[in-house]
Amino acid sequence: MSPLHRAIHARAGELAPALAAFALLLCLFSGYFMLRPVRETMGIAGGVENLQWLFSATFIAMLVAVPAFGWLNARVPRRVFLDWVYLFFASHLLAFAWLLWRIPDPLWTARAFYVWLSVYNLFVVSLAWSLLADVFDRQQAKRLFPAIAAGASLGGLLGPLAGGLLAGHLGAAGLLMLAATLLLPTLLLRRWLMTWRATDGAGRPGAETEPPERPVPGNPFAGIGLVLGSPYLLGICAFVLLLTCTSTFLYFEQARRVAELFPNRTQQLRVFSLLDFTVQALSLACQLFVAGRVAQRFGVTALLGVVPLLVALGFLALALLPQFAVLAVVMVVRRVGEYAFIRPGREMLFVPLGAQRKYRAKNVIDTLVYRGGDAMSAWLKTLLDAIGLGAALVALVGAGIALAWSLLGWRLGRWHERGITAQEVGP
């Protein structure tokens, strides 16, 4: 075994697929994080006081997109489904590139792009993890997912760096075209991974899995029914809702503070880029050197339960010392924890499930539930501000939510570790 095998806990024959999965996430996140700082400045351009409307618009867009996703999923073989979705989104990136080239600084194009990129991000990432949960079996996922997730963090490092270096030469339209180009290698990687799956992965001879040559059956709303009929999936839904609530509280406070302290758009872009770079660098280090060891020694329970507890402590620190520096540290801890620990742990929860739940139900949770939680949390934060609760009291509310999030994370982790019964999964 090579040092790299040992570093990522790969066994014989697993290094190549782990690297292919790593590269797939690297391409996706490099493209997205080139565009994320652009999205943040566009959100502020419309007014921080209007962010809740953008969150609501994103949720409404999800209400349309999720049934369309389900309709296509029932008609396209699982083996090539990712190709169809990614080519669809690549065409939209090119369309927005043309719009930004023709109309360089329109307010409504900026708002539309903010909403669209929020939809794009969740769909392409959710589908990539659905693919990986389909390719690797339960034990392979537990060993390899933390290292594979490092591809996302490396992409999060390279994306802003490339965006910063190329923005002056290519402009926003050129960056969108480059992001569309980065989707193309993922199609080749998907094909190779599905071939490996049939011989050495979750679909190897003797494994009880559904063949990927057929579409995932069900009507366009089947994913919603699967979620509502499963205590296990409803638990994951509640976990995601609590995650989005803490995230949105911090996000709104960050946007408000950045708008106050850095009124210039160029300064705002630099602040967001610096925060993104810091988050991704720390996430990459944790994914490569910490998360895998935590998963091996303490299991999914630790991946899901510890970070929310740290976020609760961060909210308490904000209540005592409501400074931008403290907020930035809490924001970094939350995002690093999500990328390095919670995301791999959350994806492991889906590995034992069937194809319908990996693709249909998972997509509903990762998109509709996630953005619904964003919208609900945005209006809750707006309500708390409107009734005159100070920043300290809002932070205390956030701490309480984070504690509930931690308790549910421990519960889901223990559920997964002991094995899920058919009754808990649902009919």
Locate predicted features.
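C-terminal transmembrane helical hairpin of 12-TM major facilitator-type secondary transporters
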Residues: A302-F341
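C-terminal ends and interior cores of transmembrane alpha-helices
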Residues: L87-P106, L309-Q323
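Membrane-embedded alpha-helical segments of multi-pass transporters/permeases
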Residues: P67, L94-W98, L157, L184-W192, ...
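A membrane-interface helix-boundary motif in multi-pass transporters
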Residues: P77-F81, A162-T181, L274, G299-L303, ...
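Intracellular loop-helix junctions on the cytosolic face of multi-pass helical membrane proteins
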Residues: M1-L24, V48, R75-V80, A90, ...
